């Protein structure tokens, strides 16, 4: 048991999670806090984020919320400075904030629709990583995790702006892994498959589909025969940012129930 505790011990570490108020981000915040990390939850969803902070604190963890739109350059720089100033360090960045965008074929997308997805999903990752790197270096090293998707690796006949953005952050993690390895900063990407999240449920409703029926259909395409949960992804992120993952950088952690192995 002692070995397990040592492998996943995040006591004394500070983790910033973008899009941390719900779904995968919220479950990651709970998981890292349970491992001992102080968690900075960054999101535009104030009500959900404040409730999550209260939940984590009630369970003996430490969490603080900052309102942040990851597309706002000055705000990103300010918030990361405030995190480092308040806690004295930053050790982990989880780039989770993202949107899906319109489910239209490429020739029907407007440039504005395309750009909005890239602004959040790609530029947001760039801005937050850029702001975090000096603080990670000052802490003696750290870990960056970019939330990509299984569709950042394989193609799919829908939401082209989203899929392109997820391929971009996959490569950004590889480049940053090479750039900052000498500073003991690791960078990896996580590639969820079909995960039941509020964002995906809302996407189905927007398309006029019943989420339960949609997930039932989707799981027939998954070798394990079931839809994943945010906890499945949070567990993978915990591995990457903890001592257990100390020799892992530039890697792709695919958590998709076997979908991309077909």
Where are these regions (language model features)?
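Substrate-binding pocket helix/loop in short-chain dehydrogenase/reductase
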Residues: 104-106, 110-115, 218
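C-terminal substrate-recognition "lid" of short-chain dehydrogenase/reductases
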Residues: 2, 137, 226-255, 260
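Active-site helix of classical SDR
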Residues: 129, 165, 173
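Short, small/polar-rich loop/turn modules that mediate ligand/substrate recognition or access, typified
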Residues: 89, 181, 186, 248-250
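Canonical Rossmann dinucleotide-binding motif of NAD(H)/NADP(H)-dependent dehydrogenases/reductases
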Residues: 9-39
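Alpha-helical segment proximal to the catalytic Tyr-Lys
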Residues: 134, 178-179, 246
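Residue(s) in the substrate-gating loop at a strand-loop-helix junction
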Residues: 149
């Amino acid at each position: 048991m002692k070995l397990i505790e040592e492998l996943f011990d995040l006591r004394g570490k500070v983790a910033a999670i973008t899009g941390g108020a719900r779904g995968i981000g919220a479950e990651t915040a709970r998981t890292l806090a349970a491992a001992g990390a102080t968690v900075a939850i960054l999101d535009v969803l104030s009500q959900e984020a404040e409730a999550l902070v209260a939940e984590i604190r009630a369970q003996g963890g430490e969490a603080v919320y900052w309102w942040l739109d990851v597309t706002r350059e000055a705000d990103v720089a300010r918030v990361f400075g405030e995190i480092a100033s308040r806690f004295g360090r930053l050790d982990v960045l989880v780039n989770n904030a993202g949107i899906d965008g319109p489910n239209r074929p490429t020739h029907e997308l407007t440039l504005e629709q395309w750009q909005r997805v890239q602004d959040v999903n790609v530029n947001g990752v760039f801005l937050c990583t850029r702001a975090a790197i000096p603080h990670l270096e000052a802490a003696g090293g750290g870990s960056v995790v970019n939330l990509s998707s299984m569709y950042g690796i394989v193609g799919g006949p829908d939401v082209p702006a989203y899929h392109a953005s997820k391929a971009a952050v996959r490569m950004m993690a590889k480049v940053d892994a090479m750039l900052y390895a000498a500073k003991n900063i690791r960078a990896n990407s996580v590639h969820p498959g079909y995960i039941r999240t509020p964002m995906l449920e809302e996407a189905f409703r927007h398309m006029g589909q019943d989420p339960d029926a949609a997930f039932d259909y989707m799981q027939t395409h998954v070798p394990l025969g079931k839809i994943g949960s945010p906890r499945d992804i949070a567990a993978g992120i915990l591995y990457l940012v903890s001592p257990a993952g100390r020799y892992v950088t530039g890697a792709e952690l695919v958590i998709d129930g076997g979908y991309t192995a077909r």
